[in-house]
């Protein structure tokens, strides 16, 4: 019995000292396996005197049960410790600042265009769209451009080999709209246009918005009132405005609109912001509208021009350089 007691003490001490699951498994095999020391004790019960077998058997069974429980407890302890160590290594430091999501924003030209469209929508104008690759009829001929007009020259217009071209204005959308609708008409067209020009105030691609109204009793006074209301709504203040006579093939009379713009030094100067005029009778005839019954007015403006004025940008090219430092100001 003393041998069993000694074996119990050694075995429990070895179990408690095991540091890894592999060590613990090797110890289990050495104690409880087919060739283990506890199994050997059970096999020796037959050699004991009959009066000692029962007590020895009970002692060995108690030892086996104690070792089984100790092994299970130690295994659970080692597995828990291993899991804690792994979790500690993978732990997320909640005190570490998160990665900030970059906040996006609309491009200033897009902001400006949407603002202009919204203003004219409140005035009852319908937004229409058309192709950027146009034919000569919709871009020039239907709009009363004579064959010798400078705008048709290669240095002003991007032509394709088949005679088509990149539209130089959105006026072609007006022609298509008048072909598809009957008066009265109230529409605007906005989008990219292309001209062979590039400097501090010009870009080979820019955005334009044009408007058209055709009705039986439209006058230049209606045009003036419409544009005055638009300028006031866009800049959110009143301006002194003047309408200078000017020439555009598709309107007669035509005018350019200037506003009294305040300079940084406090002085004011006249600043051109858009062109306009009464729709030329030839344009109405080209789309099947009787100029004896209907009159109309049209206007056009450069969106980048208004964006430069609204946001105080001096160089048009800044809108197209994709400099994040510049664009972030509008996010």
Curated annotation (Swiss-Prot):
Alphabetical GO CC annotations of the entry are:
cytoplasm
Which of the seven top EC classes does this enzyme belong to? ligase
Which PROSITE patterns does this UniProt record tie to the protein? AA_TRNA_LIGASE_II
Q: Which superkingdom does the taxonomy of this entry point to?
A: Bacteria
Q: Where in the cell is it found?
A: Cytoplasm
User: A Gene Ontology MF term for this entry?
Assistant: ATP binding
Q: Which reaction does it catalyse?
A: tRNA(Phe) + L-phenylalanine + ATP = L-phenylalanyl-tRNA(Phe) + AMP + diphosphate + H(+)
Its cofactor is: Mg(2+)
**What InterPro entries has UniProt attached to this entry?**
aa-tRNA-synth_II, aa-tRNA-synth_II/BPL/LPL, Phe-tRNA_ligase_II_N, Phe_tRNA_ligase_alpha1_bac, Phenylalanyl-tRNA_Synthase, tRNA-bd_arm
* Keywords tagged on the record: Aminoacyl-tRNA synthetase, ATP-binding, Cytoplasm, Ligase, Magnesium, Metal-binding, Nucleotide-binding, Protein biosynthesis
Per the UniProt entry, the Enzyme Commission number(s) are: 6.1.1.20
Q: Name one Pfam family in it.
A: Phe_tRNA-synt_N
What is written in the cofactor note of this entry? Binds 2 magnesium ions per tetramer.
TM ranges: none
Binding locations of Mg(2+): 252
Q: Provide the primary localization.
A: cytoplasm
Which GO terms are recorded in the biological process aspect for this UniProt protein?
A: phenylalanyl-tRNA aminoacylation
Q: Which HAMAP family match?
A: Phe_tRNA_synth_alpha1
* Family to which the UniProt record says this protein belongs: Belongs to the class-II aminoacyl-tRNA synthetase family. Phe-tRNA synthetase alpha subunit type 1 subfamily.
Assembly and partners are described as: Tetramer of two alpha and two beta subunits.
Can you say what this protein is called? Phenylalanine--tRNA ligase alpha subunit
What is the gene name?
Answer: pheS
């Amino acid at each position: 019995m003393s041998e069993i007691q000694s074996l119990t003490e050694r075995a429990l001490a070895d179990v408690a000292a095991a540091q890894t699951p592999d060590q613990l498994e090797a110890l289990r095999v050495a104690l409880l396996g087919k060739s283990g020391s506890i199994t050997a004790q059970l096999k020796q019960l037959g050699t004991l005197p009959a009066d000692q077998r029962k007590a020895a058997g009970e002692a060995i069974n108690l030892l086996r049960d104690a070792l089984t429980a100790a092994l299970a407890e130690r295994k659970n302890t080692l597995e828990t410790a291993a899991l804690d160590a792994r979790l500690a290594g993978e732990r997320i430091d909640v005190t570490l600042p998160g990665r900030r999501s970059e906040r996006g924003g609309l491009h200033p030209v897009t902001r400006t265009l949407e603002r202009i469209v919204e203003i004219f929508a409140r005035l009852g104008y319908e937004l229409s769209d058309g192709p950027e690759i146009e034919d000569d009829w919709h871009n020039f001929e239907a709009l009363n451009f004579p064959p010798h007009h400078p705008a048709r020259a290669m240095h002003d217009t991007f032509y394709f080999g088949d005679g088509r071209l990149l539209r130089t204005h959105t006026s072609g959308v007006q022609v298509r709209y008048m072909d598809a609708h009957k008066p009265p008409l109230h529409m605007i067209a906005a989008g990219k246009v292309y001209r062979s020009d590039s400097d501090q105030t010009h870009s080979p691609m820019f955005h334009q918005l044009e408007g058209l109204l055709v009705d039986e009793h439209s006058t230049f006074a209606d045009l003036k009132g419409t544009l005055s209301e638009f300028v006031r709504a866009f800049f959110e203040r009143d301006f002194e405005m003047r309408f200078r006579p000017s020439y555009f093939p598709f309107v007669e009379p035509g005018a350019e609109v200037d506003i009294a713009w305040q300079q940084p030094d406090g002085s004011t100067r006249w600043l051109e912001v858009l062109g306009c005029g009464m729709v030329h009778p030839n344009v109405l005839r080209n789309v099947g509208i009787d100029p004896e019954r209907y009159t109309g007015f049209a206007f056009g403006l450069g969106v980048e021009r208004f964006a430069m004025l609204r946001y105080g940008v001096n160089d048009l090219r800044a809108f197209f350089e994709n400099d994040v430092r510049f664009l972030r100001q509008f996010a």
